[in-house]
């Protein structure tokens, strides 16, 4: 079982010969050790156009659960993320943003655990790392968010044992203040996180109505800006492939392309590779991007093709060939998914309902029969996706 969002394996305080990923974990650990004690102390039109012209038939799966509608009317629900409870996977947490008000926490059945009013939190992403020395090993989870109210990148750091205790005591919630905050020089939009061999814990922060992307990392001094690059146009959805050091990012509006940046220690973003475009398999805006990892460094890149309400699968590895597409259709009790912004997928056995992982998708048009409700998130067993598409596991 694989999970893009956490890295396992004990990390020792003394430096030693390591593989690249272990070096990245060591870099994060070095920062954490110095910070640990302080913790303890304290495009609707485009969518309509492309939906009307696209009549192609695609395989369909059904959501098995959905979350309650978010508190805000209109275009509000946006981006999901997940924390895997490795001690009790069925008691994991789904995070979801209401980009006009804050962050929700849900269980795997879509039931609300908590809601924190934080302002305009647009996108979120997580990484969990097993850190410690010979005497003390703990998992820490890092929750990144793009805060449009304050124009910042926000970062919460949770010790997983404490999170588990709060879940058991029904007292879990995202704190109202982050552990770290970095003031951005752009109008913030989307965000995705990663673990990099050179820079450790990183976050890619995109610009609203602009082409810039900021790259941040966690240091002993807090969140530092590493560099800023030009992605060519407004971008939101992104995902970082830690093992392959590849940033996938969707450019919206005029061009409508999905790009891949294959990186090295120089973090040179000058030569993106075009994975797909509107001339290919993308309808309208490319939006949320996620990874579904399979053994031997294989797996799938998944993109929300928003304009025709489908999800595209590509090979995770270069040259990222398009494989197929699917939709999330309606069941007797849950409506279909359309006009999706953010998505999240992982390959991890969470429960008997999710034997091969999970997919969470924002639903841009949430309905109850003929009645339109506020937006929400739909939850899919990824086994159903693999079965209906008949692709390699």
Feature map (PLM): residue ranges:
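N-terminal signal peptide c-region/cleavage motif recognized by signal peptidases
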Residues: 51-54
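Short helix-onset patch at the extreme N-terminus, typifying the N->h transition
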Residues: 7-8, 27
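Methionine residue identity
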Residues: 1-2, 18-21
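Sequence/structural signature of beta-propeller domains
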Residues: 57-393
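Bacterial N-terminal signal peptides that target proteins for export
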Residues: 22-43
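Hydrophobic helical h-region of N-terminal Sec-dependent signal peptides
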Residues: 44-48
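Short hydrophobic targeting helices and cationic amphipathic motifs
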Residues: 4-6, 13-16
